[in-house]
């Protein structure tokens, strides 16, 4: 009952792992001194080799450091293959006893059969050009979570968040109409409003356009944005 397994190393998974770890480290010893904090184990399982894959390398590595400091057990390159309510199984054969499984990994990107796998990049995303056209095809487009428009400014593609899908959806609708009307089209321009993730008490990571920072000030910014959205 005291083992928690979180699946997915995106913002939701990272924030959940940080919150549970903070509870284990600070609240449990204070409110329940009869229970040692060692009885609570927190696992974060990620299918690829990094956390916060759509954020900067700095944000990813710092997040891992924060979680390790909080004694979160981070497992990379692991896929959950089964869960029977008591035990989590991964494709590599690992078994973790846990009554508490929290799924934050979302869903796997799906696309029609026939798409050449050489156009599929990390995260099962389709590589597109600057017009959101899938590379290697004339009339196949991709947008939202499944699209990866890789450029110098976005080496990992755009963030897999609602704002990206909204902007790309609007752009693609206008672009397809302009193509049908033989009108000139412009490449997609993403208006980056920044990415934030909190990793426990007074710790966070922030990617804001050309500015990337971590720690207390990133957490303070996250708190302000969160309060403004309520």
Task: Name each region found by the language model.
Residues 164, 168-230:
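C-terminal, flexible cofactor-proximal segment of oxidoreductases
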Residues 3, 19-78:
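Rossmann-like dinucleotide-binding cores of NAD(P)H-dependent redox enzymes
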Residues 43-45, 75, 102, 141-143, ...:
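Hydrophobic/aromatic beta-strand patches that form the interior of the parallel beta-sheet core
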Residues 1, 86-89, 95-167, 174:
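FAD-site-proximal beta/loop scaffold in flavoenzymes
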Residues 76-87:
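A conserved short coil-to-beta-strand element within the FAD-binding core of flavoproteins
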Residues 7, 14, 45, 143-144:
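Active-site flanking residues adjacent to catalytic metal/cofactor-binding acidic residues
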Residues 1-7, 12, 23, 102:
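FAD-binding core/adjacent interface of flavoenzyme oxidoreductases
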